[in-house]
A protein has these predicted regions:
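Short, well-structured segments within or immediately adjacent to enzyme catalytic domains
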Residues: 1-213
Length: 213
């Protein structure tokens, strides 16, 4: 991640254009960036998945797709193999995303880069969370039934502990998640509100309690 930022004016990976929205990748096997993300003729607009931004590390930083699988906790994600999707004439670096079903080939969540405040090593807080084990709210295999953000009791019996742990990633038995911070350190956090000023790393802040999103 740091190598990429050093090569790209301190900016972290961000697929598409500066005005692309979070959505789907138009054509993950396209021959050029415009077709891959559905950009306009002037190079603006389009949409991209979060995983396509991570895939830029495959294209430009020599990271292998297998590096995006959590070997210790994610038993469902499989190493990306383009041949399984009928693509046999291109190398990994020729593509733009982890196939048509990227969630099956990437275990990690990445900060929301499609917005007014993308991460930069030059201007962002070193305590900012950059990447983390998969978001439980976007993971079809993770049960968040009954979880309430205003019930974060971490004391008492086993059920209380299991309750607040529902805000954690589904990997690692809901005990916490590995978080990569901007200053390059990785820490296993046992709660999801571990960002700057206790920001919840899995949710979008609505202006109220930053721990809830």
């Amino acid at each position: 991640m740091s190598i990429y930022a050093n090569d790209w004016d301190n900016c972290f990976p961000r697929a598409g254009s500066l005005t692309s929205k979070w959505g789907t990748t138009a054509n993950w096997q396209a021959d050029n960036r415009s077709n891959a993300f559905g950009l306009k003729s002037d190079g603006t607009g389009g949409s991209a998945t979060i995983s396509s931004s991570l895939y830029l590390l495959v294209k430009y930083a020599e990271v292998l797709p297998k590096s995006f699988i959590c070997q210790s906790g994610d038993l469902r994600a499989k190493k990306f193999n383009p041949a399984k999707y009928g693509v046999r004439d291109k190398e990994f670096e020729d593509l733009w995303d982890f196939g048509p079903e990227p969630a099956k080939h990437c275990s990690y969540s990445y900060h929301m880069c499609y917005g007014p405040y993308p991460l930069s090593t030059a201007s962002s807080d070193p305590g900012q969370a950059v990447a983390v084990d998969r978001n439980p709210w976007l993971d079809p295999y993770t049960d968040t039934t009954g979880f309430k953000w205003n019930d974060q009791t971490k004391t008492g019996g086993r059920e209380n502990i299991k309750g607040y742990q529902k805000g954690n990633s589904g990997l690692h038995k809901r005990e916490g998640q590995n978080v990569l911070f901007l200053d390059n350190h990785v820490y296993f956090e046992n709660q999801s509100f571990c960002g700057v000023k206790n920001d919840n790393i899995y949710t979008y802040w609505n202006g109220s309690d930053i721990r809830q999103g």
